[in-house]
From Swiss-Prot:
Family as reported in the entry's similarity comment: Belongs to the IucA/IucC family.
MF terms (GO), sorted A to Z: acid-amino acid ligase activity; ATP binding
Key words of the record: ATP-binding, Ligase, Nucleotide-binding
Pathway given in the UniProt record: Siderophore biosynthesis
Protein name: 2-[(L-alanin-3-ylcarbamoyl)methyl]-3-(2-aminoethylcarbamoyl)-2-hydroxypropanoate synthase
InterPro entries per the UniProt record, alphabetical: Aerobactin_biosyn_IucA/IucC_N (IPR007310), IucA/IucC-like_C (IPR022770), IucA/IucC-like_synthase (IPR053631), LucA/IucC-like (IPR037455)
Presence of the UniProt keyword RNA-binding in the record: no
Entry-linked NCBIfam families: staphy_B_SbnF (NF033586)
Coiled-coil ranges (or none): none
Length: 616
């Protein structure tokens, strides 16, 4: 009970700070952010059957009433054809007796509404902190953008740093717990800061390293930081009495260095097992994931480094076993591609290889300290998209495909005008979907291909192929359904302790539904559905028609490859599929999978007889 009371005090303190700060922010921006947080929250509460509610439909419009203690909340919403997703279409009213007032007070709503499961006050208050921090940081971001409007994007990096709307379903889409507003300004991707990395030299026996074929670590390191910095680092190492071949040089995010390394590894720095080398000169911008650093010099590698913060409800550290799997999975995927002429020569899919992974693993530390630094120090080196583009090609992140410029004009507007909305959309869907279903059906591999993990490669706006990234914890398979080319992979097992804190993070499973729905959830439910809804809103192409095009692309693939056994194991046309309950995960323990069944727009039935099945 004491913990809960402390959390209440913490919340009120945050609210006081917010109230004071809001006196100087643009009220229009503030209202827009509060409304977005409120709408995404309420949509997810209904969608995941978290709250007790009533719904009735008149002329296709849903009238919803959420039950509260001594109050109720009313609004209208539509149920889309895309997995029954809820889109709120009116202001939300709080009703007490005969009085009704429009509200965006999501903290009051969460404390008043009746849940469908026993309410955990501590988890609830922690979730409220995430929502408040999302409101703070998105308001800060939008106000900064208004005062410093970015130029119209032209290159991949421009789009990467411009499209900063965040998750369109998750209500705490920009929480960044652990960052102050000052930290957010210095390290948040919304502000396109120039960031320099700190570097450590660590005794090799304290580091687990995984290296892709044909990679020479020190040569790659020298190319990344430059000859002058590399030689300076070597001198530092030798001055400490060590040899460069006896240590590993690992980059550290400056926030992580200040808040974690300097504190939790102070003893190791003092006894010399961890040596601080200093700062390198090359500049990086943080990508939308925050922990992936994008070099301004596009000849260099992306560096994914842990930051001990929480964003969209996920810890942004790097679990050691996933780092240690990075290069193996990269070599596995690229070997599959070399043996698959359709994937290599027709689809020409790009896999941005994670060619080097290093994680700090000191078994001599006490169990307590090992827990403290778990996943807090390590790096994954990833190939740069610019290394892969040829001739007239350019690339754009998938999340930028449903984003707009400062005047509200979609980034894809000129392409739609040039090629026509129907022709462009059909081409885009074919280019995006065929590689994903080929890897699933032919090789038995599903990818967690949400918008941050996919890039569209195009020639003058015409979609030609895709690039994929983030494989170290973003693929899933059932071994008996792998193709011969894919059957030879040895993985570092997930520690039992990691399963207890994140039961959703695994690569291999015995449940084939969890393979199929891994693709359905990230790719179709979050990624493609968002683009389809955007196309309908902006260009008037009916949502249901677009899903028929998607279904046609899958059926055409099956006709071209009729012999594949995996069609019976990974049926993308089943009436319902399982998707993750993202908000429920914040309100209950994360020790088990939180999933529910939703209507599949590719399956039989459809919107007219769709119901979301409640699973608590």
């Amino acid at each position: 009970m004491i913990v809960v009371q402390t959390l209440f005090i913490h919340i009120y303190q945050i609210q006081f700070v917010i109230t004071r700060r809001y006196r100087i922010v643009n009220q229009t921006i503030l209202n827009r952010v509060k409304t977005r947080v409120m709408h995404q929250l309420v949509s997810s509460l209904i969608y995941e059957n978290i709250v007790v509610y009533k719904a009735s439909y008149q002329d296709g419009v849903g009238h919803f009433t959420i039950e509260g203690h001594d109050s109720e909340y009313r609004f209208t919403a539509e149920k889309t054809h895309s997995f029954d997703r809820i889109r709120i279409t009116s202001p939300i009213e709080r009703v007490v007796g005969d009085e009704a007032d429009t509200t965006t007070d999501y903290t009051q709503l969460l404390r008043e509404v009746v849940f469908t499961f026993p309410k955990n006050d501590e988890k609830l208050e922690q979730f409220i902190v995430e929502l408040l921090q999302t409101e703070l940081k998105d308001t800060q971001s939008m106000q900064y953008r208004e005062s410093n409007p970015p130029a119209t994007p032209e290159t991949f990096n421009d789009y990467e740093f411009y499209a900063m709307e965040g998750h369109q379903y998750h209500p705490s889409y920009k929480s960044r717990l652990g960052f102050t507003l000052s930290d957010n300004l210095k390290f948040g991707p919304d502000f396109v800061p120039n960031v320099k990395l700190q570097w450590l030299a660590i005794d090799k026996d304290k580091v687990e390293t995984t290296v892709s074929r044909n990679v020479v670590v020190n040569e790659m390191l020298r190319q990344q930081v430059g000859d002058k910095t590399y030689e300076h680092f070597v001198q530092q190492i030798e001055a400490s009495g060590k040899h460069v071949n006896d240590v590993e040089m690992i980059p550290v995010h400056p926030w992580q260095f200040e808040h974690v390394i300097q504190v939790d590894l102070a003893e190791e720095r003092l006894n010399g097992t961890v040596l601080w080398l200093g700062e390198s000169d090359e500049l990086y911008h943080p990508q939308q994931s925050i922990r992936t650093m994008s070099p301004i010099d596009t000849t260099k590698y992306y560096l994914k480094v842990p930051i001990s913060i929480t964003n969209t409800s996920t810890k942004r550290v790097l679990a050691p076993h996933t780092i240690e799997n990075a290069a193996q999975i990269t070599d596995w995927l690229k070997q599959i591609q070399q043996q698959d002429m359709y994937l290599k020569d027709e689809l020409k899919t790009v896999f941005l290889g994670e060619v080097l992974g290093q994680s700090y693993l000191n078994t001599q530390l006490s169990p307590y300290k090992q827990t403290q630094v778990y996943g807090a120090l390590g790096v994954i080196w990833r190939e740069n998209i610019y290394h892969m583009l040829i001739d007239e090609e350019d690339a754009i992140p998938f999340n930028a495909l449903y984003a707009s410029d400062k005047d509200g004009v979609p980034f894809i507007e000129n392409w739609i005008k040039q090629y026509g909305s129907e022709a462009w959309t059909k081409q885009f869907l074919a280019v995006a979907i065929r590689p994903m279903i080929h890897m699933l059906y032919y090789h038995g591999i599903a990818f967690e291909s949400h918008a941050q993990n996919m890039m569209l490669i195009h020639e003058n706006g015409w979609p030609t192929r895709i690039a994929l990234k983030d494989f170290h914890d973003g693929v899933r398979f059932k071994r008996e359904h792998l193709s011969e080319a894919a059957s030879h992979l040895t993985l570092k097992p997930m520690p039992e302790a990691h399963k207890k804190v994140n039961s959703n993070s695994f690569i291999e499973t015995d449940d084939e539904r969890l393979v199929r729905d891994f693709l359905h959830d990230a790719f179709f439910f979050i990624n493609i559905a968002e683009i389809i809804l955007f196309i309908e809103k902006q260009y008037g192409i009916d949502e249901e028609l677009q899903w028929q095009w998607v279904k046609g692309i899958i059926e055409a693939y099956q006709e071209a490859f009729p012999e594949l056994n995996n069609y019976q194991h990974f049926d993308l046309f089943e009436p319902t599929i399982q998707v993750e309950k993202l908000t429920t995960r914040r309100l209950l323990s994360d020790s088990e999978l939180r999933i529910h069944h939703v209507t599949n727009p590719l399956g039989v039935g459809g919107i007219n007889d769709a119901t979301t099945i409640s699973e608590t």
